[in-house]
């Protein structure tokens, strides 16, 4: 699935938050990451306006990745092994994909062993390399 895992996101945020302003849009079921800006009230339009003024979007493949593309913003997106960026990604984004014999799996309802392997193989260091590349381009 498209979930990289809460612990992975925490590790990544902890590596970048001292040098960058990290804004985390939240909803009722969001797990808050301590030490970053997580406004309690941010509707979709406000989030899009903030993204328009941002240097980079980092997150899972999905709605805000498409918003970043529509705004022609740089992005680093986690695809895991769920769906190929060849199908739904944008070539000007840094798309992180777990390409193996079982990819893409398309599993939605549960974390399959393939997606669990993707979480383990796509490391924080891989994300950091993609972030550095995106910010240099």
Q: Which residues fall in each region the model found?
A:
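Donor-binding and catalytic core of enzymes assembling or modifying cell-surface/extracellular glycoconjugates
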Residues: 3-81
